[in-house]
Amino acid sequence: DTMLDVYRIPLKYLYYNDENGRISTQIKREFGTLMAQTDETSPDYNNKIATFIEEDNATALKKTKKSIKEKGQQVYGYVLQDGRIIDGNRRFTALRQLQTEIGTSQYFEAVILPFTYDAKADRAQIKRLELAIQMGTEEKLQYDPVDLSVDIYQTIISDR
């Protein structure tokens, strides 16, 4: 049985996964292209994706934010070495909002996976992990069938 190390990561080093099916579909619809970057570099990217997540399910986000405010982050996320969030978009969004509202530094608790989208060989592995995490947690938002299809297609076909 292997234990995973969970780290408390300052939010400024993290960014939403532009390779995520739902997010990449939204980026293409709204902006055409959008350069993924951390808040430390420029908060514009994370702010635009956060707005999409807020609009996508305001009730779920409000519930997550209230829970984190009262009890702290109960479920850790998963991030890649470069700060790309593979699991935990809603928690990250809630923490960013709390950081702004409260005015104190917040930290995203996550396992750091030893992969990067820069390495083509890692992409399929990352997608398998992302989907396994997504399917293994009941409270996740369901993927729209089109977003899921685009996600799978982009991973399998465009990485050839």
Task: Map each language-model feature to its residues.
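Short, charged/polar connector segments at secondary-structure boundaries
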Residues: 1-106
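Amphipathic, charge-rich alpha-helical segments that serve as recognition/docking helices
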Residues: 49-53, 100-160
